[in-house]
Amino acid sequence: MEKMEEKKRIVLVPVPAQRHVTPMMQLGTALNMKGFSITVVEGQFNKVSSSQNFPGFQFVTIPDTESLPESVLERLGPVEFLFEINKTSEASFKDCIRQSLLQQGNDIACIIYDEYMYFCGAAAKEFNLPSVIFSTQSATNQVSRCVLRKLSAEKFLVDMEDPEVQETLVENLHPLRYKDLPTSGVGPLDRLFELCREIVNKRTASAVIINTVRCLESSSLKRLQHELGIPVYALGPLHITVSAASSLLEEDRSCVEWLNKQKPRSVVYISLGSVVQMETKEVLEMARGLFNSNQPFLWVIRPGSIAGSEWIESLPEEVIKMVSERGYIVKWAPQIEVLGHPAVGGFWSHCGWNSTLESIVEGVPMICRPFHGEQKLNALCLESIWRIGFQVQGKVERGGVERAVKRLIVDEEGADMRERALVLKENLKASVRNGGSSYNALEEIVNLM
């Protein structure tokens, strides 16, 4: 590593996934603007586009991670993949920090690591370096992990066979019920609960930073600080604190030109994130329902997101023609710009936390189609607490798709949701202005370091 300027350096360790890398790089940009140099430690298989988007950052690759190619995620599943990363990366990360300290002197102000990269805690302890945990998910999701870590997987499975237990409210997490806890779609429960215990273990960390906003999750933030016993800083929405291009996927900006030709608040934007896969039959039902709604739509279909297909070549030609009459399909969109476009009236989303925050910041109400884990928690909050969206559950069929789009874009109920979303939009934007809760939290973090 080259000798850097005489200013304190922060080491960032993100999870190798779009939804984690994006807010971590936004955090790095915010701290860089406060005078810190930024070093990003990444694996061989999760390269961030450093030369293009972050020329002022230093990027270091952990050695010996070639044994964990991306295909391992598909084979192991998310929980076991994270265990494997933490097992194989601890020693090489320590070597990385040791080499850095030898070459550049004791200029590391702090190691900030994604909550899933908890192997960093051992290096922070060994070299007596301050560390801070960063969560890219909601505070409510964090609190739910505090609940799960105290449970027995075997007993939980038995208890959840009782419908009454399923509907029981989780203490201090209203309206969350036990059946809403993020346990689905991630593999065996015993390993999930073990991972929750590792994540919630603060080790030697002096604080937790969360990409959320106090006005959205004040009760969960208070509960989390009580559970962890260290300061919890709500620093979001990070994407409006800074403007940092950090997408790992190439964005198709042609859709903005298409949006320019549409009427205000008429378009439904559909994007189910960077991971979700759908069956061809579901995509066909979705396409017909969108067409029948008589509303223009912008639809993100990632390559590989239709099971068994490279992209949309498996769809019948008449469906492609039908979609092109009323809609526009891209492989990936500049989502923040799309949501802020005056033509967009609603967002059909998987309810990942980044997408949820980005939609609220633009005052766009949502159709919630969560698939697993924390997405279901976010959808519950959108529907039952903030009341700026509604869930569509069960089998995807054209009639349900058509009704959902009309409910959001055309009906009075959708207009009411939009009004509430616009109020939240102003609250979130106020949080990052001088004197706002997130603005003040960033100042406190800088002083902490």
Curated annotation (Swiss-Prot):
The keyword Ion transport does not apply. Keywords: Glycosyltransferase, Transferase. It comes from the Eukaryota. Its EC number is 2.4.1.-. It is an enzyme of class 2 (transferase). InterPro entries: UDP_glucos_trans. UDP-alpha-D-glucose binds at residues 274, 333-335, 350-358, 372-375. PANTHER family: GLUCOSYL/GLUCURONOSYL TRANSFERASES, UDP-GLYCOSYLTRANSFERASE SUPERFAMILY PROTEIN-RELATED. Belongs to the UDP-glycosyltransferase family. This is UDP-glycosyltransferase 76E6. It comes from Arabidopsis thaliana. The lineage of its organism: Eukaryota, Viridiplantae, Streptophyta, Embryophyta, Tracheophyta. The gene is UGT76E6.
